[in-house]
Swiss-Prot record:
Gene Ontology biological process terms in this record: 'de novo' AMP biosynthetic process; IMP metabolic process
UniProt source species: Aggregatibacter actinomycetemcomitans
Pfam families per UniProt: Adenylsucc_synt
An MF annotation (GO) of this entry: metal ion binding
Catalytic activity: IMP + L-aspartate + GTP = N(6)-(1,2-dicarboxyethyl)-AMP + GDP + phosphate + 2 H(+)
Oligomer status and interactors: Homodimer.
Top EC group: ligase
Protein name per Swiss-Prot or TrEMBL: Adenylosuccinate synthetase
Keyword Zinc-finger: no
Main subcellular location: cytoplasm
């Protein structure tokens, strides 16, 4: 139960029956492989329901969101004729994964090569660290660019000090990071919505909602094979990662490897 159980495939099979598919934890490390009309698609951040025209996809506050990864995934889907922007909604409370998170991930794995955590190198762990430390930048910060630029400068000073002085690697460039984020900021903020309210309204309307986990149960930060785990709660993160009341969940489907 450390991944590759077929979660993405089962989600894809169930999406014909639902109106919403929700990602509530993890980052761009899901790696859900889907086959639709004979074409293979790998989704790492965007919910698997995006391939179904009848489904609205939601990214909840528990997901750490990489602007670069989101743009790449959107581009790949749109090039294949998938309507993403009108059917994907994002919580403003999603922490952002930025280049310094990725740099820190790689620096740590190199430093502790003899006993690595086997991180994906995508900055997911460091982004969750920033969230817990209450210093991270979030999607909602993109609405105020002046404030975002100031916050980015402060946090990048913090990261670059560690990268240069402890890990002995190159610092992350502030201006490039800022320019790259601002280049896609309008696209991201255009998809921001109140995910909790949408889910509550859907529940009251009797709409079917499917919550899509990104990792297996044994990778749960609290209940998995610590320390070789991910940085979030897997099944248990549904409520806190989306704002959906836990008592409103009426069915849980677990996917188990047969070998």
């Amino acid at each position: 139960q450390w991944g590759d159980e077929g979660k993405g495939k089962i989600v894809d099979l169930l999406t014909d029956r639902v109106k919403y598919v929700v990602r509530y934890q993890g980052g761009r490390g899901a790696g859900h492989t889907l086959i639709l009309n004979g074409e293979k698609t790998v989704l790492r951040l965007i919910p698997s329901g995006i391939l179904r025209d009848n489904v609205t996809c939601l990214i909840g506050n528990g997901v750490v969101l990489s602007p670069a990864a989101l743009m790449q995934e959107m581009s790949e889907l749109e090039n294949r004729g998938v309507n993403v922007r009108d059917r994907l909604l994002i919580s403003e409370a999603c922490p952002l994964i930025l280049p310094y998170h990725v740099a820190m991930d790689h620096a740590r794995e190199a430093r502790w090569a003899k006993r690595p955590i086997r991180a994906t190198g995508r900055g997911i762990g460091p982004a969750y660290e920033d969230k817990v430390a209450r210093r991270g930048l979030r999607v909602g910060d993109l609405f105020d660019r002046a404030a975002f630029a100031e916050k980015l400068k402060n946090i990048l000073d913090y990261y670059n000090f560690q990268l240069v002085n402890y890990y002995k690697v190159e610092p992350v460039d502030y201006q490039k990071t800022l320019d790259d984020v601002f280049a896609v900021a309008d696209i991201i903020t255009g998809m921001v919505a109140d995910i909790t309210t949408i889910l509550d309204t859907a529940r009251k309307n009797g709409d079917n909602i499917l919550f899509e986990g990104a990792q297996g149960t044994m990778l749960d930060i609290d209940h998995g094979t610590y320390p070789y785990v991910t940085s979030s709660n897997t099944a248990g993160g549904v409520a806190s990662g989306s704002g959906f009341g836990p008592r409103n969940l009426d069915y849980v489907l677990g996917i188990i490897k047969a070998y």
